[in-house]
A protein has these predicted regions:
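N-terminal secretory signal peptides and thylakoid transit peptides that target proteins
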Residues: 1-18
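Sec/Tat signal peptide C-region and signal peptidase I cleavage site
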Residues: 23-29
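Transition segment at domain starts
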Residues: 30-68, 100-102
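Short edge beta-strand/loop segments characteristic of extracellular beta-sandwich folds
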Residues: 62, 74-80
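An anionic, turn-rich surface loop/hairpin at beta-sheet edges
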Residues: 93-118
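Extracellular Ig-like/FN3 beta-sandwich strand-entry sites
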Residues: 119-123
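Short beta-strand edge segments in extracellular beta-sheet folds
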Residues: 141-147
Length: 151
């Protein structure tokens, strides 16, 4: 007869196998390789599904004026506009401009933050891609004193 301990151990093994079989497919499903491989801001926005970018006072980008360590630069993007499909954070002079892509639903407020690696001083963009494909942006210059990309 099987003991309770053996039953729990076998159940944990089965649950682990089932979980590991399904999750990797979902983790890779939302990755947009073309957008993250794009070299320029406009190319990344286009690959993410947006059109030509236009500046907007309704989109905000937050970050330091001077980043002492380019390896961990705190950046934020937000907007109160309705109908936002995606929010992007881009660093113009990084080898790959797109730093972060956030998918937005109607149930979520479009207010995101992350930390980025910056190799040099650059303009940083927050781009809101709307449901109709319009891409609205805000821009901020961040000066880096110590490079994060091998500097």
């Amino acid at each position: 007869m099987q003991t309770r301990r053996e039953t729990l151990k076998q159940s944990a093994v089965v649950a682990g196998l089932l979980a590991s079989a399904g999750f990797p497919q979902f983790a890779h499903a939302a990755f947009n390789k073309a957008a993250f491989d794009a070299k320029g801001v406009q190319d990344a926005v286009k690959a993410a599904g947006g059109g030509a970018i236009a500046e907007s006072k309704d989109v905000t980008i937050t970050g330091p004026d001077i980043a002492e360590n380019g390896a961990v630069v705190p950046l934020g993007a937000s907007t109160s506009l309705p109908g936002v499909k995606q929010m992007l954070i881009l660093v113009e002079k990084n080898p790959a401009a797109l730093v972060a892509m956030f998918h937005v639903s109607d149930a979520v407020e479009a207010n995101f933050s992350t930390r980025a690696k910056m190799g040099q001083s650059s303009d940083v963009y927050a781009v809101a891609i709307m449901a109709d494909g319009k891409a609205l942006y805000a821009k901020k210059e961040v000066k880096v004193t110590l490079g994060g990309c091998g500097g």
